[in-house]
């Protein structure tokens, strides 16, 4: 339980004062409730479990004050969410963006013209557009801390919501209602980015080390590992001083599957590399390396299993810091890369022992691990780490990889000993 308690603490502590944090499912809700209700952590934050928002009783509860947090700013009356509107059709009647307040007003209206007929003949509320305009109150966004003063110029005038499906559920209707009424006075956070996926809002996030802040700054998602912009001045102190990881670094502590899964889902170790990379972009290379070291110290690979997303960015950042002149950064990168490559090779060797039907079953895993090994191999090539390239070359040769497919670092054998090469076809 210690790990989950810390996880709840980290989510709450990553948020700005007076925030609303939207959770998804049990694993990232109960730890926050535990911290807040039992230990009095961050009573100013309103925790809202989106999995419950389909229930009218929960919407009613969310409208009320809890601890030191005012209610969630919903405006729709009970008649619009009690035993009705479990699903709301989206019918694209306008080819332009409609203001979000007008959309909610349309749903609130009892005018028959604001209804649509379903296939069974019943009339129901609907959303008349897929594209919704959410105007940005820039002064409020600065005053509430949603946007730092230094980032004022990066704010957009309007955030555009793009509904991706032909209907939304009650949870999404209530989130739209909240967006129409929060007026940028209270920071909104998500524990999981996917809460905003169906609204097309993934490009308006900021990763604050644990939770994601909804911001009026456009940051297009380039890859799934790096969703959201980063404000290093906000996130670095949290990672260094505020967040807690319990005694996970103690080898006597068993990090079971659920701990591994939850730390992976919350990007706990990846966060250090992501913020370090932002520091590198600001020419703060020494600080970046300190952060990388701390991430591996608090959440060591010996405890928290390697994944490509919690390892590869560390390697990139160490080698980049080395190129920027930080003394031992490349050596640290080498040590981590060797440990990771050794683990990948152990996986590959283990799965290569299977043949027949079992061999077929594990071949996708072999392909995945070979891909990951290839990624770090080419990173080593890019960073000019000849010794490591030679070590991985030797392994590739044992798999029967042809010389022309290997990067030559002056390690070609004069005569290949053919006894090494015959291998099962699974290595293809």
Model-identified regions with their sequence ranges:
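ER/secretory pathway lumenal C-terminal domains and tails of membrane proteins involved
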Residues: 2-18, 30-428
């Amino acid at each position: 339980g210690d790990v989950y308690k810390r996880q709840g603490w980290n989510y709450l502590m990553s948020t700005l004062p007076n925030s609303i944090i939207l959770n998804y499912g049990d694993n990232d809700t109960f730890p926050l409730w535990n911290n807040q209700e039992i230990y009095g952590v961050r009573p100013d934050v309103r925790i809202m479990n989106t999995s419950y928002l389909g229930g009218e009783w929960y919407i009613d509860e969310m409208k009320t004050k809890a601890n030191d947090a005012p209610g969630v700013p919903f405006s729709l009356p009970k008649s619009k969410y009690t035993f009705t509107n479990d699903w709301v059709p989206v019918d694209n009647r306008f080819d332009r963006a409609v203001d979000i307040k007008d959309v909610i007003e349309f749903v609130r209206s009892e005018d028959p013209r604001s209804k649509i007929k379903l296939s069974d003949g019943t009339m129901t509320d609907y959303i008349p557009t897929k594209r919704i305009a959410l105007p940005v109150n820039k002064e409020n966004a600065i005053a509430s801390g949603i946007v730092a003063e230094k980032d004022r110029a990066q704010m957009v005038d309007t955030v555009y919501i793009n509904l991706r499906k032909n209907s939304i559920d009650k949870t999404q209707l209530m989130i739209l209602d909240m967006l129409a009424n929060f007026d940028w006075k209270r920071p909104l956070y998500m524990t999981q980015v996917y809460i905003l996926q169906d609204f097309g809002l993934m490009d308006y996030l900021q990763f604050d080390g644990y939770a994601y802040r909804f911001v009026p700054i456009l940051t297009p998602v380039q890859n799934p590992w790096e969703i959201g912009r980063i404000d290093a001045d906000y996130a670095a102190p949290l990672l260094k001083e505020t967040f807690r990881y319990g005694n996970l670094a103690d080898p006597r502590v068993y990090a079971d599957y659920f701990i591994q899964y939850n730390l992976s889902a919350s990007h706990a170790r990846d966060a250090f590399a992501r913020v370090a990379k932002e520091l590198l972009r600001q020419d703060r290379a020494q600080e970046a390396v300190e952060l990388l070291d701390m991430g591996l110290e608090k959440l060591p690979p010996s405890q928290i299993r390697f994944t490509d997303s919690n390892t590869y960015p560390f390697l990139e950042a160490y080698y980049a810091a080395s190129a920027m002149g930080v003394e031992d950064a490349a050596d640290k990168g080498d040590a981590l890369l060797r440990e990771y490559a050794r683990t990948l090779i152990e996986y590959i060797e283990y799965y290569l022992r299977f043949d027949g039907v079992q061999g077929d079953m594990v071949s996708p895993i072999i392909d995945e691990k070979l891909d990951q090994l290839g990624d770090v191999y080419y990173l080593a090539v890019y960073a000019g780490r000849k010794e490591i390239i030679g070590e991985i070359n030797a392994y590739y040769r044992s798999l029967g990889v042809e010389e022309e497919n290997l990067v030559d670092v002056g390690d070609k054998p004069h005569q290949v000993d053919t006894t090494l090469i015959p291998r099962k076809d699974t290595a293809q």
